[in-house]
């Protein structure tokens, strides 16, 4: 339906021109990353613009989103560990005994890194430690501090049942082992090109995070975690106007997203959520959360779709209106010709399903809050700015990535 070029990119241009800090989610091969870099130059954007890629190591900045100096609250840090494991579990995962036991290990190990080894408190260090240490070493590590013992109580209390302990640990390592072994992801998440505090009043930032279809199951939970980290920093004291721009937003799941637009709007935060059809929201978040998400967006655009489930709901958004129907009857008999004209009024859908299947690219109907047009049916101009290829951030060799990974291994081997 042309949503990105006709609605998305013009909105992105407006946010950047207005000097908002932001988080941009890019799904299509650096498309929005190129756009953002171009717009930053075009509009003399006053803040830093950083790009994150987990596939192209020369066109990515590196950052540690869970760095203790960034996540300064222990309770928040532990909640982020919960968010990460939940994201790797998927939407159909159960928070059962095994999940809770695995989460206890993750939180117990993580809090020790946070407090005792802040220089190694990165996602790559934590997951590699958990996946390589084994039951005996992890038990000893968790017993090293009272706080970690409490958090991992279920695992430690099962000390007399090696089978139970192994089940808890394997539940965790099965979720994290692929991440621990992905050297490029470890490279990106163990660097410090910038602090992942996007609403720092002294240094606001625009960050463009790119997914990749080939490994999206691996990196989507990481991106979800990064968004959660940034969103949990907001308070009423925030003075930095901020926006989340999520193109193809249903290609990953965000913890508690149904609450975010309504809550964060009080903190100077705006959302753009683009998806191919509303039915995809329901697939990711469920029926009731979909309703909550949709109700929290004041401006809604509906374009062409042939999604059967979406076509059931789209006409309901705009309701019905009374329309006059005129029927004419003609008859003849020996006495001559008879004609009658009947006018009736009946309620019909303002836009029916056929209407939504026949919209052109860039053509949308919708409703807007606080606007001079409450409802609209328009065809928008396409964004046509010429964009340059993404610049190289750092020249990177394969040996650099390997050396970084081996350094992580050396770091965790020295931890007691």
Language-model features: locations:
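P-loop NTPase motor domains
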Residues: 1-269, 284, 295, 354-416
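Conserved ATP-driven motor cores of ASCE-family P-loop NTPases powering translocation/secretion/packaging/pilus
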Residues: 261-263, 267-368
